[in-house]
Amino acid sequence: MLGFLPLP
């Protein structure tokens, strides 16, 4: 998703 969190 955001790039700086471990999510797409």
Swiss-Prot record:
The keyword NAD is annotated on this UniProt entry: no
Keywords, alphabetical: Toxin
Covalent link (Cyclopeptide (Met-Pro)) residue numbers: M1-P8
GO molecular function, one term: toxin activity
Posttranslational mods: Processed by the macrocyclase-peptidase enzyme POPB to yield a cyclic octapeptide. POPB first removes 10 residues from the N-terminus. Conformational trapping of the remaining peptide forces the enzyme to release this intermediate rather than proceed to macrocyclization. The enzyme rebinds the remaining peptide in a different conformation and catalyzes macrocyclization of the N-terminal 8 residues.
Highest taxon, organism lineage: Eukaryota
Functional description taken from the UniProt entry: Cyclic octapeptide that belongs to the MSDIN-like toxin family responsible for a large number of food poisoning cases and deaths. Cycloaminide B is non-toxic to mammals but shows immunosuppressive activity, probably through the inhibition of the action of interleukin-1 and interleukin-2.
Family membership: Belongs to the MSDIN fungal toxin family.
Identification of the protein by name: Cycloamanide D
Species of the source: Amanita phalloides
